[in-house]
C-alpha cells in the first residue's frame, strides 16, 4: 500500500496557501506536517482525506496496482473531537463502534488502552480539554484502518498523555500502519518524513 500526493496546491479565495507539494508514504511510516497557524495544515489533511479538492495535483492510494479512495482506508481526527457533548463517554464510543461496523476493540477496551476507564459513565462535556482529546483518540482503536490522518492530536494533552499517545502511534506503525499528522510539537518517535509547509508557500505570498 502506497499513499502519495503529487504537485498539490490549495487556494483560499485569491491567496495561494501552498503549491508544488508532493509526498509518498509507505507502511510503517510517520509523516508530520508543521508550520504556523493559518498556513494550511488542516487544509492539506482534508485534501488527503478527500474532504477538500486540491486546486492542483492529486492524491492516490494504491495497493497491488488497485487504486482506492483514501477515506475507505483511514481514520481522520480533525480539530474537533466529533463527540456528542451530552452523551456519556461510553455511549459516544458505542455510537462510533456501531458506525464503523468492523470491530477491533470494544469501547471499554479502547478506553482502557488510553487509561480512561474511569471516565466511561461521565457526560463528554464535563471532561477536561485533554481528556476529551484522549477519548477522541480512543475512537481510532475501535476499528482497524491502516492510515491515521490526525490534526493536532496532542493539543491540550499533558506529558503523561503525550507519552501514552506516542506509544500508541508506535504500535500502529509497528503493525504496518501509516500516520500523517499536523503538529506543532514532536511526538517523541522517529519521523520518516517531515513537511515544513512554509517551504511550499510561493515567495510572493511569503513576503506578504
Swiss-Prot record:
<dbReference type="InterPro" id="IPR003593">
    <property type="entry name" value="AAA+_ATPase"/>
</dbReference>
<keyword id="KW-0813">Transport</keyword>
<comment type="function">
    <text>Part of the ABC transporter complex CcmAB involved in the biogenesis of c-type cytochromes; once thought to export heme, this seems not to be the case, but its exact role is uncertain. Responsible for energy coupling to the transport system.</text>
</comment>
<dbReference type="GO" id="GO:0016887">
    <property type="term" value="F:ATP hydrolysis activity"/>
</dbReference>
<dbReference type="InterPro" id="IPR005895">
    <property type="entry name" value="ABC_transptr_haem_export_CcmA"/>
</dbReference>
<dbReference type="GO" id="GO:0005886">
    <property type="term" value="C:plasma membrane"/>
</dbReference>
<keyword id="KW-0997">Cell inner membrane</keyword>
<comment type="subunit">
    <text>The complex is composed of two ATP-binding proteins (CcmA) and two transmembrane proteins (CcmB).</text>
</comment>
<keyword id="KW-1278">Translocase</keyword>
<dbReference type="InterPro" id="IPR027417">
    <property type="entry name" value="P-loop_NTPase"/>
</dbReference>
<dbReference type="Pfam" id="PF00005">
    <property type="entry name" value="ABC_tran"/>
</dbReference>
<keyword id="KW-0067">ATP-binding</keyword>
<keyword id="KW-0201">Cytochrome c-type biogenesis</keyword>
<keyword id="KW-0547">Nucleotide-binding</keyword>
<comment type="similarity">
    <text>Belongs to the ABC transporter superfamily. CcmA exporter (TC 3.A.1.107) family.</text>
</comment>
<feature type="domain" description="ABC transporter">
    <location>
        <begin position="3"/>
        <end position="206"/>
    </location>
</feature>
<dbReference type="InterPro" id="IPR003439">
    <property type="entry name" value="ABC_transporter-like_ATP-bd"/>
</dbReference>
<dbReference type="GO" id="GO:0015439">
    <property type="term" value="F:ABC-type heme transporter activity"/>
</dbReference>
<protein>
    <recommendedName>
        <fullName>Cytochrome c biogenesis ATP-binding export protein CcmA</fullName>
        <ecNumber>7.6.2.5</ecNumber>
    </recommendedName>
</protein>
<feature type="binding site">
    <location>
        <begin position="35"/>
        <end position="42"/>
    </location>
    <ligand>
        <name>ATP</name>
    </ligand>
</feature>
<keyword id="KW-0472">Membrane</keyword>
<keyword id="KW-1003">Cell membrane</keyword>
<dbReference type="GO" id="GO:0017004">
    <property type="term" value="P:cytochrome complex assembly"/>
</dbReference>
<dbReference type="GO" id="GO:0005524">
    <property type="term" value="F:ATP binding"/>
</dbReference>
Amino acid at each position: 500500500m502506497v499513499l502519495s500526493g503529487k504537485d498539490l496546491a490549495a487556494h483560499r479565495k485569491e491567496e495561494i496557501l501552498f503549491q508544488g507539494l508532493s509526498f509518498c508514504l509507505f507502511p510503517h511510516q510517520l509523516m508530520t506536517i508543521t508550520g504556523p497557524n493559518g498556513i494550511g495544515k488542516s487544509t492539506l489533511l482534508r485534501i488527503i482525506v478527500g474532504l477538500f479538492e486540491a486546486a492542483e495535483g492529486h492524491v492516490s492510494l494504491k495497493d497491488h496496482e488497485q487504486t482506492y479512495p483514501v477515506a475507505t482506508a483511514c481514520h481522520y481526527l480533525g480539530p474537533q473531537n466529533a463527540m456528542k457533548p451530552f452523551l456519556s463517554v461510553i455511549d459516544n464510543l458505542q455510537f462510533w463502534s456501531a458506525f464503523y461496523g468492523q470491530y477491533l476493540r470494544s469501547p471499554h477496551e479502547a478506553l482502557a488502552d488510553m487509561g480512561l476507564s474511569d471516565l466511561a459513565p461521565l457526560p463528554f462535556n464535563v471532561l477536561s480539554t485533554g481528556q476529551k482529546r484522549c477519548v477522541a483518540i480512543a475512537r481510532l482503536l475501535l476499528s482497524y484502518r491502516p492510515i491515521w490522518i490526525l490534526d493536532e492530536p496532542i493539543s491540550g494533552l499533558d506529558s503523561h498523555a503525550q507519552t501514552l499517545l506516542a506509544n500508541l502511534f508506535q504500535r500502529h506503525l509497528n503493525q504496518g500502519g501509516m500516520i500523517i499528522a499536523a503538529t506543532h510539537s514532536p511526538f517523541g518517535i522517529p519521523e520518516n518524513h517531515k513537511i515544513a509547509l512554509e517551504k511550499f508557500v510561493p515567495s510572493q505570498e511569503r513576503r506578504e
